[in-house]
């Protein structure tokens, strides 16, 4: 008897998930494999996937357009949280995993599957994100992970697939592993496994090399409503369209490349390349607007919440009680994060050059050093005396 009768497989069309189809049937005795590919903004890349899955042995191939849901329910909360794992990575790939897990669980219920499966290896973070998210949504649903058990190298995996007529989507001489959605691309493996190796220009697709970017800067204005991006250069746009347009504008100016050594949840370090033009610019603009409208204590406390939120999402705990509690705090802080941020895009850099909001806490007549100054300078002496009292008492008590 096989490990399951009917399985819904998270499918990308890549090497591992394609090989999973014959492997589940030939090695694990699965009778029927239904593939599910989530369209999260890949666009034309998903065109041949449906037929490829069927050619590889799937009984049914599902392609679900979840791009709007992805942006609305996953990317936008990440912007409100200013999510940057280890201060750099905006979670472009990690954010997709809980949504794909949700789609898998829903498809399993709809098609009467007794298990779901994914093609994650035992060294990555995605296996945790999928397994934990699926368990949170349906603790009784079995999860199969062939690539975690089959013990094949990437070259052996490609060879196994070729035995069943599955063409390799990459050259064996340069086997990059690439994941893409509307928010950006992640690239790893191959020559990138050497942390000293400079990525070749062939690695990038969304961003221009600095040498090829325009010699004149571009200025853009981003409008936010309660922490959510709503306008680009004064034009109201749907969430997906806004990110698409901003990806093109920022990528044209070489903005959005990340090359980092990342600490994975499983305890190893990994060299990762990311391209996330729009997401990085939106987080930068959102952070700046918050500095204008939030009180100092809320802003400072939120930094710790943001770090915890980013770690939870990176580590696969999107559906955890702690993240839900942090979500509530973040949403409370966003009620007055409404306004406009102006940025200068030039030669790989996005620089905030202006911001405005009707909710602004910036008081010109309190901040100015000119004749309009209304700050009570005489009050400073008493404030300093009280503020410094603990330090003064400590010094008086312990001085030699």
UniProtKB/Swiss-Prot annotation:
The keyword Nucleotidyltransferase does not apply. GO terms for molecular function: argininosuccinate synthase activity; ATP binding. GO terms for cellular component: cytoplasm. It is an enzyme of class 6 (ligase). Pathway: Amino-acid biosynthesis; L-arginine biosynthesis; L-arginine from L-ornithine and carbamoyl phosphate: step 2/3. Homotetramer. This is Argininosuccinate synthase. It comes from Synechococcus elongatus (strain ATCC 33912 / PCC 7942 / FACHB-805) (Anacystis nidulans R2). The gene is argG.
